[in-house]
């Protein structure tokens, strides 16, 4: 089996990407998409090219668009360091590390629902969980 990872970004033509994967002999992709709707669209394209799709789900370090929404609606969901500084406001090694706090029941409920929503998409054949750890 020959697989790769791919993030569905606005500047990527997914039809072309899956065509190249098929031509290269890939069997599957761990795909990160911004929304269930994007997964649905991408799964349809992948199927035409014989590519199996596993959802590559970013858990405690949500992607930029999702992170921004959480920061606006639930700033208290982010991890706090020993100095009382939230990763929502203070850099933890790199600017993209804005980790949610897994100790909060609300965060766990949010992540469970996110995975359930993705698992309900016809054609998503597996899940690859990423960023399932505490911030460095």
Q: Can you annotate each of these PLM segments?
A:
Residues 5-9, 34, 58-62, 131-134:
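Active-site beta-loop-alpha junctions enriched in small/polar residues
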Residues 14, 39, 107-111:
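Aromatic/hydrophobic pocket-lining residues that form the small-molecule binding cavity
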Residues 8-38, 121-124:
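Catalytic domains of carbohydrate-active enzymes, especially glycoside hydrolases
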Residues 37-43, 63-67, 136:
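Extracytoplasmic/secreted cell-surface and envelope-processing proteins
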Residues 21, 53, 111, 118, ...:
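Conserved, mostly hydrophobic/aromatic
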Residues 22, 40-50:
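Surface-exposed amphipathic alpha-helices with a cationic face
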Residues 1-4, 29-31, 53-57, 127-130:
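Hydrophobic faces of well-ordered beta-strands that scaffold small-molecule active sites
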């Amino acid at each position: 089996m020959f697989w790769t990872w791919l993030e569905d970004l606005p500047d990527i033509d997914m039809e072309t990407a899956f065509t190249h994967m098929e031509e290269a002999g890939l069997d599957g992709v761990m795909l990160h998409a911004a929304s269930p709707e994007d997964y649905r669209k991408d799964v349809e394209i992948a199927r035409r090219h014989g590519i199996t799709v596993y959802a590559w789900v970013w858990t405690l370090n949500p992607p930029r668009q999702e992170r921004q929404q959480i920061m606006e609606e639930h700033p208290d969901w982010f991890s706090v360091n020993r100095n009382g500084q939230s990763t929502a406001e203070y850099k933890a090694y790199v600017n993209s590390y804005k980790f949610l706090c897994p100790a909060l029941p609300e965060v766990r409920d949010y992540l469970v629902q996110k995975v359930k929503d993705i698992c309900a998409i016809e054609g998503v054949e597996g899940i690859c969980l990423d960023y399932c750890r505490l911030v460095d």
